[in-house]
Swiss-Prot record:
Pfam hit, one: Lipase_3
Originating species: Ajellomyces capsulatus (strain NAm1 / WU24)
Stated family: Belongs to the AB hydrolase superfamily. Lipase family.
Gene: ATG15
Keyword Hydrolase: yes
Protein name: Putative lipase ATG15
Length: 585
């Protein structure tokens, strides 16, 4: 461990830009040190905005006074209302977390993970199992209040407030539309400032590209919840990085680098938390959120060991395994869904395909909208309303909106569901992942078959089915040579029509053998080379010798009058020779 301590010490010597940038001189003390009440009222105190894509260094804070009027911009439109109040109950729970959770220490661990491409392994001395105060997820009013906190995105009525720069100003106030790009956090506090509820804004209501942060949410969704940056899947998925190697093969080091960039929601959430702990150093912090905001809330809770309650959150175990979060002793960093005592509770219902991890088919609304929702595993415990079985609902994206969840699910049920972990879940089981330096190109093997035809010479006498020139074809097993005595001058349909010369050497015929058979007749046939081929044989005249008929010798001459299609039309001459006469016995 000495080497690790030395590395951590060296990292601590350098000032991290994101840490220094999020320090705020504002500190709000705890007003009452009495034991924490079971039920408390929470009101909106601050709104924090952290830039991501266009202004990653932007960090602003808006303080809310009790008499401040707000525009409540919800999925059902905008309306004016006063600062809301919510009643929340608490109960103690156990959370397995780091003993030293200072922002600088945790950032050092994350920096080591970035450099080594693996999470830091710490001994049990660095960990503790704490009993902390957390929202009572068995109380319906508490669950309903937390859900309502996540439902609205509040904006100030023009002229009633001013955004302050948390970091030194970079003239972002003069940049039009800065408030539509980034991660928004709403800070609720009880009357004594002993407990703070951080609400992170999730995916915009519109599935397809539109106003607000919808496009940025899509990029973060596809980074967090796809197996490989929305690559290797459906055509409509929006690709957000280039880490795909081959079929179902992905470079995890490349994905980790993309997830940890400064313009991503996880990094923005870490910076928001850094500023919140600077403002409330002695307060107990809870985190909640809906959809993408719920997933980011869970990742933030796992990083710092915070109580988390989410609603219809996207399954977040996959990005948790890639962010380099320090795992407790005896746990697998690649399977955070198997961890116990995380302090995270995920509320959802069975008709929501995003919460259930099934919004990834070829014709699903998520896919058609460009979202690659391939993850299906949650960390912590699942608190699931079975609306499909109880109410006969059909699975649909319309049931994902938080307003419908509040009115049609949470308020409709008399009790909250029982929460339980699901540790046997597996993400991307058909993919292969490897570690590689991003600067080194991944070798790709391509097999190419080339067919080449080689002609030995130019054909001088083409025919109907090939070349009539004399050729020599060498083979490895046998050699066949076809030799023509002369070049064909008169090619025909099925061969050469040039006249040929055949020489026949007379040979004395032996005496026939007489066999006592009735009738004693023996036939011998002698045929020379066929000069007139026919359709089913040779049309040359044949000579047949039947004893005691004299033998016949046929002499052929070159054809002077060839036929129209085949054969020779010359007259043939036959010479008969008398066999030798033997004396009678």
């Amino acid at each position: 461990m000495m080497g690790l301590d030395l590395l951590v010490s060296l990292l601590a010597l350098s000032v991290s830009p994101c840490i220094a940038a999020t320090r705020s001189p504002l500190q709000i003390p705890v007003l009452d040190t009495q034991p924490i009440e079971t039920g408390r009222e929470f009101t909106l105190r601050h709104m924090l905005h952290h830039g991501t894509y266009r202004d990653p260094l932007l960090h602003k804070r808006l303080d809310i006074r009790p008499d401040t009027l707000l525009w409540a911009a919800s999925e059902n439109g905008e309306k004016r209302e006063s600062v809301p109040r919510f009643r929340v109950s608490s109960r103690p729970i156990n959370i397995h977390r780091l003993s030293d959770r200072h922002v600088s220490v945790v950032e050092d661990y994350l920096s080591i993970a970035r450099m080594t491409s693996s999470a830091v392994t710490l001994s049990s001395d660095y960990w503790t199992l704490d009993e902390v105060d957390a929202p009572d997820v068995t109380d319906k009013e508490t669950v309903l209040s937390l859900a309502k906190m996540t439902s609205n995105a509040y904006i100030m009525i023009p002229g009633s407030g001013e955004w302050f720069d948390v970091v030194p100003p970079f003239n972002h106030s003069d940049s039009f539309g800065w408030d539509s790009d980034g991660l928004r956090g709403h800070i609720y506090s009880d009357n004594t400032n002993s407990t703070i509820v951080v609400v992170l804004k999730g995916t915009s209501a519109a599935i397809f590209d539109g106003g607000g942060t919808t496009t940025n949410d899509k990029v973060n969704d596809n980074l967090f919840f796809s197996c490989c940056c929305a690559q290797g899947g459906h055509y409509f998925w929006r690709q957000v990085c280039d880490c795909y190697s081959s079929t179902y093969t992905c470079n995890t080091a490349c994905v980790r680098k993309a997830l940890r960039q400064e313009n991503r929601y996880y990094r923005a959430a870490l910076n928001l938390y850094s500023n919140i702990t600077a403002m409330y150093p002695q307060s107990n912090i809870w985190v909640t959120g809906h959809s993408l905001g719920g997933a980011v809330s869970s990742l933030l809770g796992m990083t710092y060991g915070l109580p988390v309650v989410t609603f219809e959150a996207v399954p977040e175990a996959l990005p948790a395994s890639r962010l380099g979060l320090p795992p407790p002793p005896g746990t697998d960093p690649s399977s955070p869904q198997a961890r116990n005592y995380t302090g995270a509770y995920h509320f959802g219902h069975t008709a929501d395909p995003i919460y259930m991890g099934t919004c990834n088919g070829a014709t699903s609304v998520c896919t058609l909208g460009g979202y690659a929702m391939e993850s299906s595993c949650h960390t912590g415990q699942l608190c699931t309303y079975d609306t499909v079985e109880d109410f006969g609902w059909r699975v649909g994206i319309g049931t994902h909106r938080i307003r419908e969840v509040i009115t049609d699910v949470i308020e409709r049920y008399d009790d909250v569901p029982t929460c339980a972990p699901f540790t046997e879940c597996v993400d991307c089981n058909n993919w292969k992942f490897f570690e590689s330096n991003e600067t080194t190109p991944t070798p790709t093997t391509t097999t190419t078959s080339t067919s080449t035809r080689t002609r030995t010479s130019t054909c001088k006498t083409p025919g109907w089915w090939g070349c009539l020139d004399p050729t020599t074809t060498p083979t490895t097993t046998a050699t066949t040579s076809t030799t023509s005595t002369s070049t064909c001058k008169t090619p025909g349909w099925f061969g050469c029509k040039d006249p040929t010369t055949t020489s026949t050497v007379p040979t004395a015929s032996p005496a026939p053998t007489i066999t006592p058979t009735s009738p004693p007749t023996t036939t011998a046939s002698t045929t020379s080379t066929c000069e007139s081929p026919g359709w089913f044989g040779c049309n040359d005249p044949t000579s047949t010798t039947t004893f005691p008929v004299p033998s016949t010798t046929s002499t052929s001459t070159p054809c002077s009058t060839p036929g129209w299609f085949w054969g020779c039309r010359d007259q043939t001459t036959t010479t008969s020779a008398s066999p030798p006469i033997t004396s009678p016995p």
